[in-house]
């Protein structure tokens, strides 16, 4: 792989946790460098490169800084991290930890694996691959001056044979095999005190993340939300992100419903010490052999679930005068031998959208090759909240066939209503597109069924409304005000494919 592009990231001398540093556009890095690899890219047209990203900076074991390099190809987190960078966003997309104490770091970024589609040498409307640099754990010692590190991009651009590659996820009932990528827990912070302490990592791994008033859907949480609970052996790694002058001995145990009753029980419980390389493996403990992956709103995680508790059985210690807490970052890499409970919705329809409170009699809804962001000015729209909707939200593109079931309720007495529901399949747009099959259902039928092909001329469809030439559905209501509600359910048929791992804020 040859040098394809370069950039630089400026770092303030007082680099604190949560600050945003810079965003580098991969395409701009390559085109701006204008080297031989860019010429190859222009010749190839579309490519699925395996980038090697080298971040060059001098090692310093005294600052305690850890940065995050986050990869987002669909502009899902750009506006949310422009001032402060919450881990709810930076850790919800593919990311890599950059420890100041380690010095220059190399990361492999396989575009074909992460996005599942080819990359064009010029800007496109559906993707814009970027590297975001933010600070996860801040410095203990302020440096003498502001500085910068260099980011080098290495790649070999060979022509791709098709636009679509391997999907990131295929909908099926047995989708989870235990492997988890990019599942990083926000820093656990230990106080410097004489009292031994513990920090808990909740195993509510199917719960939707929350940032203030916003929900953040990411792939790992969505994948695990397909199941009610899970058991097995949690494998992962602990990164001690403090300066080298700090020290700690950690023991991890899995506990149900809170913490151990006394210190002796901690050593009697099955557990393990964190090895020098940070690795650990611990079986989930639960009276049900499984722990729930989500909770009811009023329930406390410490009372109804298993947790991984990281006990500081010795330390943390630091030189006199230090007051900053000791940050530790946990990454979960696998749940080996997963003991999965029943699916949340086994082989069933998902609620897509409800329409109600109609204010006009003649109503028409455009259902494009996408799933969400449906709106109306003449009725009330309520979108369903379910794993399938979340999976589409946390990907850039999707493709497959949906079986649709339409149902409605009437305002007046049954048998005395008139009007109907017309469903038409179309391609392109109303003015220049083509009309396909159409059917009319009387309101007194109370429902009907159809299907929708999700995709466009390129194959998979971006999460935008009719952004490319694609198939879509028009639902026209006659005498809409005589309906209380129109409900649309959907069920993915066969292998429904998702491309481009990312996240989504609502």
Swiss-Prot record:
Domain of life, per lineage: Viruses
Record carries keyword ATP-binding: no
GO biological process: transport of virus in host, cell to cell
UniProtKB keywords: Capsid protein, Host cell junction, Transport, Viral movement protein, Virion
GO cellular component, one term: viral capsid
Transmembrane region(s): none
Gene3D superfamilies assigned: 2.60.120.20
GO MF, one example: structural molecule activity
Keyword Ribosomal protein: no
Post-translational modification remark: Specific enzymatic cleavages in vivo by the P1 encoded 3C-like protease yield mature proteins.
Pfam name, any one: Nepo_coat_C
InterPro entries xref list: Nepo_coat, Nepo_coat_C, Nepo_coat_N, Viral_coat
Role according to the record: The movement protein is assembled into tubules that allow the transport of virions from cell to cell.
Further facts: Virions are comprised of 60 copies of the coat protein.
Similarity annotation: Belongs to the nepoviruses RNA2 polyprotein family.
Protein known as: RNA2 polyprotein
């Amino acid at each position: 792989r040859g040098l394809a592009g370069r950039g630089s990231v400026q770092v303030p001398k007082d680099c604190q946790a949560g600050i945003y540093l810079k965003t580098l556009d991969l395409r701009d890095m390559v085109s701006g460098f204008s080297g031989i690899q860019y010429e190859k890219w222009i010749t190839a047209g579309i490519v699925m490169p395996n980038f090697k990203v080298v971040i060059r900076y001098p090692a310093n074991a005294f600052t305690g800084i850890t940065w995050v390099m986050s990869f987002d190809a669909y502009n899902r987190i750009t506006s949310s991290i422009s001032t402060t960078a919450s881990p709810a966003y930076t850790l919800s997309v593919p990311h890599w930890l950059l420890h100041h104490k380690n010095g220059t770091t190399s990361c492999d970024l396989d575009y074909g694996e992460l996005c599942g589609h080819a990359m064009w040498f010029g800007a496109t409307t559906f993707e814009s691959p970027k590297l975001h640099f933010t600070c996860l754990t801040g410095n203990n010692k302020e440096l003498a001056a502001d500085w910068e590190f260099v980011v080098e991009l290495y790649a070999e651009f060979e022509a791709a044979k098709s636009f679509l590659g391997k999907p990131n996820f295929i909908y099926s009932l047995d989708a989870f095999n235990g492997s988890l990528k990019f599942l990083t827990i926000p820093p656990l912070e230990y106080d410097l005190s004489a009292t031994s302490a513990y920090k808990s990592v909740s195993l509510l791994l199917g719960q939707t993340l929350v940032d203030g008033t916003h929900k953040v859907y990411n792939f790992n949480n969505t994948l695990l939300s397909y199941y009610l609970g899970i058991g097995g052996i949690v494998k992962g790694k602990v990164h001690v992100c403090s300066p080298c002058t700090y020290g700690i001995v950690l023991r991890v145990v899995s506990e149900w419903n809170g913490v151990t009753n006394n210190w002796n029980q901690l050593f009697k419980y099955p557990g393990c010490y964190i090895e020098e390389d940070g690795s650990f493996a611990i079986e989930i403990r639960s009276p049900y052999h499984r722990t729930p992956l989500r909770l009811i709103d009023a329930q406390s995680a410490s009372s109804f679930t298993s947790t991984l508790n990281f006990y500081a059985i010795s330390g943390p210690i630091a030189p006199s005068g230090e007051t900053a807490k000791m940050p530790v970052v946990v990454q979960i890499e696998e749940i080996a031998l997963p003991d999965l409970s029943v699916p949340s919705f086994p082989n069933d329809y998902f609620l897509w959208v409800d329409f109600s409170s109609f204010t006009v009699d003649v109503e028409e809804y455009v259902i494009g090759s996408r799933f969400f962001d449906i709106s109306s000015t003449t009725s009330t729209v309520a979108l369903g909240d379910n794993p399938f909707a979340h999976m589409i939200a946390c990907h850039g593109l999707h493709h497959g066939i949906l079986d649709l079931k339409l149902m409605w309720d009437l305002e007046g007495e049954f048998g005395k209503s008139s009007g109907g529901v017309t469903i038409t399949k179309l391609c392109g747009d109303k003015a220049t597109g083509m009309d396909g099959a159409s059917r009319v259902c009387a309101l007194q039928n109370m429902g009907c069924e159809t299907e929708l092909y999700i995709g466009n001329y390129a194959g998979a469809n971006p999460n935008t409304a009719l952004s490319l030439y694609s198939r879509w559905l028009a639902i026209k209501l006659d005498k809409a005000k005589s309906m209380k509600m129109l409900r649309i359910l959907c069920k993915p048929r066969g292998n429904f494919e998702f491309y481009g791992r990312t996240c989504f804020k609502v």
